[in-house]
Amino acid sequence: MKRASELKIVSLLDNYLPPKIRDSVILQTLLENYVWKNSRKHVIDFRLKSFDYTDSDLEEIYENLAIERPSNRPTDLNQTCINEILQSLHGETILEVGSGRGYLSELLSSRGKSVTSVDYVEPHSTPGYQFVKGSVNSLPFEDASFDTVVCAHTLEHVPDIHGALDELRRVTKSRLIIVLPRERPYRWGLNLHMHFFPYMWMLKPLFGQRTHSSTSFKDLGDWFCVEDKIR
């Protein structure tokens, strides 16, 4: 399913179904049979248990899902966000954290950027960039190692979202780009999300007030967030 199609389905479920139906056992059963299928054991109670998971627990879940529920979709980014990322890069050294199947890293590498990517699960191939297996909460790089750091559709999966954001900031030299889904918090969903940002103002407590950086937000179907360091 393309990201644009998924956005329409999520919007329909979140905004037009009454909450009593949206959180009902009926919807759970439909998702089990038509969306989750063989991977239901990993996702049925994920949101209920999500903040008890360790990094190793999450790594195991995502590795199993990559086998049990392989996706034909090359990226979770919609095309508008991809275009905005390409126009927003600073410098030549790029880090993508939560690179998934490697679509964006390959695209940036093909445009002449020096790209490093980090994820729990290794991609099938890394033809034009360096891959490092690891966690957003513990990045194996020196401070200010990359001109631009990109983290798309990842922080919503991380229990310690503030710690992860601090780690992304640590390795950023100039610009940090973060993409987050615009989604309401319900028990049953199409994904393994822990954090939800249905409104733009809910992003501000996450990013906070910082004296040495400036932050901007755009609604591009998903939230497109840019934080620039001020020297």
Please give the residue ranges for each predicted region:
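Conserved N-terminal segment of class I S-adenosyl-L-methionine
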Residues: M1-S138, E142, L165, R182, ...
